[in-house]
Amino acid sequence: FWDNAGRIILSTALKKLKEEGDCSVQNLYEVLVKSSLKDYSQFFLGTEAAPFTDEKGDKTTFSIRSTLVSQIACLKHLEEKSDFSIRQWIEDESESGWLFLTARPDQRKTLKPLITAWMDIAINALMTLDPDSQRRLWFIVDELPALQKLPSLEAALAESRKYGGCLMAGIQSFPQLINIYGHSTSQALLDLFNTKIFFRSTDPNTTSWISNVLGEAETKEVQENLSYGSNTMRDGVSLSQNNLSRPIVLPTEIMSLKDLECYVKLPGQYPVSKLAMNYKPSVKNSKAFVTKEEKPKKAKISQKIISQGKHSLNHEMG
């Protein structure tokens, strides 16, 4: 309830500010975070968000607002100085190159909602284009559970191929995905990834699940039975054949994989393969992260008064 109510409030605020012609990030942050309860309630009066921002229901309104504020705290770090648009970049067929959406470990918690939103915007922008089997646009997510829930992910995995979309995502373990998307949706997502690559895992539940995904192979086992009688003429040998199903890859084999070794399962009638890769160091072409220049802080009024006082005193003494 709290998350859904927050989404309604955020979308309503964006729509209303756009209609008023003042849809800047700072104005959005002022309305949702800094405004008083009275102004906050008045802003949403007569909109679909009104039931969640009613001044009379201050406890519920405060709880919903607190949930929303915790998710949009990253907006205060954005500046109104760039005309770059992710949607326009996706829609411009002449554009090429890479767009990196990343954050340092100490910034991830704050920027997680923002990076998730950017990724979702990019995926949705692709699926607004005309279908084109010759187009190729890759979405590579290094750690899928490191993001919040991507609303467009399931639809993108099922439909983006006709728009030229290719998605690659990495996870450490299946329970991480379940924690965000739930069991049924997580299973559906993994089914939609046609090509699967599994590296070493030490968790028994995860390795058992991987073994099941890689499948089983049917083998024929011949058993020889001997029978003995009181007379040598009654001795006999009989052969029986049994069909057995065994895992192609045992969980213990997944646990014992070396670094850069993996099992690959491709779509179609291709056998499961074990691969060994060679490590190729990346070339450092530029700095991994460049911090923006801090704006000079304005001097406090008290500091100005003291400074002016000292200047006046020195002037009189001179």
Kindly give the residue locations of the regions a language model identified.
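P-loop NTPase motor domains
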Residues: 1-166, 180-183, 192, 252-273, ...
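Conserved ATP-driven motor cores of ASCE-family P-loop NTPases powering translocation/secretion/packaging/pilus
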Residues: 157-159, 163-263
